From Swiss-Prot:
Involved in syntrophic growth of S.wolfei with butyrate, as part of the butyrate oxidation pathway. Probably catalyzes the hydration of crotonyl-CoA to 3-hydroxybutyryl-CoA. Homotetramer. This is Crotonyl-CoA hydratase. One of its GO terms (molecular function) is crotonyl-CoA hydratase activity. NCBIfam families: PRK05809.1. GO terms for biological process: butyrate metabolic process; fatty acid beta-oxidation. Its EC number is 4.2.1.150. Induction: Highly expressed during syntrophic growth with butyrate (at protein level). Seems to be constitutively expressed. Belongs to the enoyl-CoA hydratase/isomerase family. The lineage of its organism: Bacteria, Bacillati, Bacillota, Clostridia, Eubacteriales. InterPro entries: ClpP/crotonase-like_dom_sf, Enoyl-CoA_hyd/isom_CS, Enoyl-CoA_hydra/iso, Enoyl-CoA_hydra_C. The keyword Acyltransferase does not apply. The active site is at E114 (nucleophile), E134 (proton acceptor).
Amino acid sequence: MAYENIILEKEEKLAVLYINRPKAMNALNKDTLLEIKDAVTAVNDDPAVELLIITGSGDKSFVAGADIAFMQNLSAMEAREFGALGQKVFRLIEAMEKPVIAAVNGFALGGGCELAMCCDFRIAASNAKFGQPEVGLGITPGFGGTQRLPRLVGPGMAKQLLYTADVINADEAFRIGLVNKVVQPEELLPEVKKIAGRILSKGQLAVRLSKAAANEGMQTDIDRAMSIEADAFGLCFATQDQKEGMTAFLEKRKANFISK
């Protein structure tokens, strides 16, 4: 698929997906969502890539939201279908086997905040802005904001942000737990790639099983969640990576993981 609204770059075991609609502040329309879906599927299916970073082109906007010009004249049925598409694409990102990090540069509003939230975690530039401003447009969030925001920052803070349409800066996003770290804009991608490097130096089968256990466990009761973790723990002991990791530890050397 030829991309017009995104850029997908690969650097050894790492892929970087840029939302690339600078004239529209990287806003999301239907075509952009379909391109993201294609790229994410390709990354997940590529055995050479083990981690994905999602960011926005330029330094002003991660994703400014869903494209209001595109949405303005949608019928109720068309709007529901557009929301369902966004939910499906973001759920695909969330459910990827491989780790996904959001490198948030500039505005992450509405659909942009929702895109960041479906990633495993978020690192923000100091100029980043977050919010779900939809009620100010007479609509609700449509790409998962009412569901993921309470899970990340708690229901009280989430409802305040949802009801007021307040936009918060990167430091406040860090304070409430929406982002893991705030860095200067010029340090954003280098810092995220540094974190990615630390992840990639570990056993990737174990990383993926850890992600799956965490994601699945949050959707069920604690007893079922513990069983999911036990299954993941047991599976690790059928891998070459477990044998290599423990042998390397005992021999006081760096492990050479092969994802098998």
